Amino acid sequence: VKLVGKSTLRLTVYPAIKDIGFAPGAHYFLYIPDRWCFWESHPFTAASWRPAGPNLTQAPEKVIVALRKTTPNSPQTSSDEEDIKKIRSNEKRKSYRRDTIIITTSTQRKPQRAKLTFLINARRGMTRSLLERITPGSSIEVPCLLEGPYGIARPVPSFPTVVIIAGGVGVSTALPYLMQHLSTRVEITKRFVLIWSVREGSMAEKILKGVKGLGFRQDVVVKVYITRSEEKDSWRLPIGVKVRYRRPRIEESIIKEAKGRVPGTPMAVIACGGAAVVDCARKGTVEALEDAAGKNGSGEIVYWEEGYGW
């Protein structure tokens, strides 16, 4: 368990079984048996999943700068052993050219363990007790029992335009869909928009740095709205992420994306966060539908809601 915000925890679970049936949007019930109320459980949406498998890495083992003679009477090629001997004998570099020899080896490390990651907003009970046991910059290990998965994976990849509105730890629902899209080369989705409102920029930095591929896809737009920023220069977000220092105008954003899509194509809107976030997203979706009602072949808008009340 690590602290990623003033009251936000990142809980990493290493399941004993390799396949736990993870899918974007899945949630699990977590039990912490080292507490007095060990029978208590809380549902949390998984923010990411890494399957078990081999951990094979290939990296340069040695980098050797070889000096080779360039005189007309000298051979143009030589073996690596000869080059190494020349370097070790400290021969003069005059009339020699430099080549780089890179020797790579594949090393087999310990097998990669399956891993589930959860983002938890500490409030009362179990989550508060975890928060009180952690100090900034440190982590703790606790036993954990996992029950799940529950929930339904939405058919997000089948929509040409996807807009996800997230508030706080509600980004747990958005991240698996975002990672799924970034890891897919051929897809139907031509525009993927994530609008995330979060109190602390440092929290956004810690969470988004684990998302690979941000800033390299023109079809992906990530907008982060910092609502309580004190030290703007103390954190950095990945390249390509747009930052605003205010609350997002959720209704306007949804209507804008609905108008900008290709006419006649469907659009998916997912809201994940507290009551204020989902209320605004629902209202914006209705207004976008009403705005498009008079247009012929405007395309449908599908709305899904993942409320966060814990």
Q: Which residues make up each language-model segment?
A:
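Transmembrane-helix exit/juxtamembrane "anchor" motif
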Residues: 1, 183, 286-290
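Canonical alpha-helical transmembrane segment with a positive-inside/aromatic-interface signature
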Residues: 1-9
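Intrinsic disorder
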Residues: 5, 16-19, 165-168, 188, ...
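FAD-binding FR-type
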Residues: 10-162, 226-229, 288-309
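ABC-type nucleotide-binding domain
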Residues: 21-32, 145-148, 166, 170, ...
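Reductase modules of NAD(P)H-dependent flavoproteins
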Residues: 85, 95, 109-113, 118, ...
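MIDAS-like acidic motif and immediate structural context at the N-terminus
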Residues: 156-180
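Classical protein tyrosine phosphatase
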Residues: 171-195
